[in-house]
Curated annotation (Swiss-Prot):
GO terms for cellular component: cytosol. ADP binds at residues 12, 16, 266, 309, 410, 414. Pathway: Polyol metabolism; glycerol degradation via glycerol kinase pathway; sn-glycerol 3-phosphate from glycerol: step 1/1. This is Glycerol kinase. Homotetramer and homodimer (in equilibrium). GO terms for biological process: glycerol catabolic process; glycerol metabolic process; glycerol-3-phosphate metabolic process. It comes from Bacillus cereus (strain ATCC 14579 / DSM 31 / CCUG 7414 / JCM 2152 / NBRC 15305 / NCIMB 9373 / NCTC 2599 / NRRL B-3711). NCBIfam families: glycerol_kin, PRK00047.1. It catalyses: glycerol + ATP = sn-glycerol 3-phosphate + ADP + H(+). The gene is glpK.
Length: 496
């Protein structure tokens, strides 16, 4: 009987189930979107029960359409939108409030108070993160402070907290396993990434009872089994968990120290594997756990760019410059350069290394000769410049010079962008055959735990390149272009 690994990719707007075979190839997939709730400006919430329903639906669809029987599943891997927070009743398994999503800013005031009390340095040292509404800790505090009776129930040990991975493992196992992995725990603002424990001082700062927290386990391990009524009568091992960006790093087989990947989605997330040492950043990067496997923990530096693919959507939908995103490449290639035009797509502020949420988008160097083509090209180039900003910070912090950059996500289909990225970084850019690296990473973690794949060396062999983009631009030219970008950033920051 042929066996497969099932990957559950629980994202911000949809849930997906993807079946992988022994070669790491996609056999079949199913996807289901769910509702976004915006109760107030800047707030983003999901219904955790609806997310659970969407997961059950995609599992059923994927298996039936692929004609794969439940007993053919060797293991389940889970990857998830990180930081999104669920608090549920231990007895009924019902959430006491909506899931508060990573993007939601509803805890910004709590963060300001914590900063004013002088906690920033302690948080940075212990967690590798900044005090920000992005991370889970303040979201848990908000739920306990704002939902009637929640704090009392939590103090009595009746409530559980989890990021989305924990919630799904709890539901799949019928409430038998309350766990998370190192990569997800490292995004909560409550976990000490050095001694790998929930931290009493951080919990006290956030007034979160320890009894709510899941057990933290390696990213590749059997956490429990599916309860038969949730998996068509089968008890399948739930064997791999990692947050989406860390899973993509694993799926790209970036196992060596200094290997890095950049995911071009709505925003960009760039992670560099720093091996077994947690590198503290001096340049606005986050220090995070990549994964824990075989008794060892790998760390990573992470840079976040807020606007990437969404800038291309803006050209299409907001500026109506083309009907299909793929046309952006055609227009950009019609001109030799941007003719001195720079677009800074700071629509929601700037991320790494600037961390400025007040600044807004800008355009510079426009003349009477500027055309639509120049404008589109400048917008695409801005993705590459922002990536260089992050890479410069990574190289400065880690002391590691990048040899190649592996890429994934929607925008990597754009050959113009990938070539320009290679030129501006002066390193080769490698695009893999399988672009679903996040789901693949979760599948690999699960497959290793159940012996479906032998080891990381076997996985490394399965990474196949679709195309390698080599830098050909003269150093002088790329330096001048990048200097222009830095000027544009400074000017943008000055206009508030």
């Amino acid at each position: 009987m042929k066996k497969y690994i099932l990957s559950l990719d629980q994202g911000t707007t949809s849930s997906r189930a993807i079946l992988f075979n022994k070669k790491g190839e996609i056999v079949h997939s199913a996807q289901k979107e769910f509702t976004q709730h915006f109760p107030k400006p800047g707030w983003v919430e999901h219904n955790a029960q609806e997310i659970w329903g969407s997961i059950l639906a995609v599992i059923a669809t994927c298996l039936s359409e692929a004609d794969v029987k439940p007993e053919q599943i060797a293991g389940i891997g889970i990857t998830n939108q990180r930081e999104t927070t669920v608090v549920w009743d231990k007895t009924t398994s019902k959430p006491i409030y909506n899931a508060i999503v990573w993007q939601s800013r509803q805890t910004a005031e709590i963060c300001d108070e914590l900063k004013e009390k002088g906690y920033s340095e302690m948080v940075r040292e212990k967690t590798g993160l900044l005090i920000d509404a992005y991370f889970s800790g303040t979201k848990v505090k908000w739920i306990l402070d704002n939902v009637e009776g929640a704090r009392e129930k939590a103090e009595n040990g009746d409530l559980l907290f989890g990021t989305i991975d924990s919630w799904l493992v709890w539901k799949l196992s019928g409430g038998k396993a309350h766990v998370t992995d190192y990569s997800n725990a490292s995004r909560t603002l409550m976990f000490n990434i050095h001694d790998l424990q929930w931290d009493d001082e951080l919990l006290e700062m956030l007034t979160v009872p320890k009894s709510m927290l899941p057990e933290v386990r390696p990213s590749s391990e059997i956490y429990g089994e599916t309860i038969d009524y949730h998996f068509f009568g089968q008890n399948v091992p739930i064997a791999g968990v990692a947050g989406d960006q860390q899973a993509a790093l694993f799926g790209q087989a970036c196992f060596g120290e200094g290997m890095a990947k950049n995911t071009y989605g709505t925003g960009c997330f760039m992670l560099m594997n720093t091996g077994e040492k947690a590198v503290a950043s001096e340049h606005g990067l986050l220090t995070t756990i990549a994964w824990g496997i075989d008794g060892k923990v790998n760390y990573a530096l992470e840079g976040s760019i807020f606007v990437a693919g969404s800038a291309i959507q803006w050209l299409r939908d907001g500026m109506r410059m083309f009907k299909d995103a793929s046309e952006s490449e055609v227009y950009a290639s019609r001109v030799e350069s941007t003719d001195g035009v720079y677009v800074v797509p700071a629509f929601v502020g700037l991320g790494t290394p600037y961390w400025d949420s007040e600044v807004r988008g800008a355009m510079f160097g426009v003349t009477r000769g500027t055309t639509k083509e120049h404008f589109i090209r400048a917008t695409l180039e801005s993705l590459a410049y922002q990536t260089k900003d992050v890479l410069c910070a990574m190289e400065a912090d880690s002391g590691i010079e990048l040899k190649t950059l592996r890429v994934d996500g929607g925008a990597v289909k754009n050959n113009f962008l990938m070539k320009f990225q290679s030129d501006i970084l002066d390193v080769p850019v490698e695009r893999p055959v399988i672009n679903e690296t996040t789901a693949l990473g979760a599948a690999y973690l699960a497959g290793l735990a159940v012996g479906y794949w032998k080891n990381q060396d076997e996985i490394k062999e399965q990474w196949h390149m679709d195309k390698r983009f080599e830098p050909t631009m003269e150093a002088k030219t790329s330096e001048e272009l990048y200097a222009g970008w830095k000027k544009a950033i400074e000017a943008t920051k000055a206009f508030k």
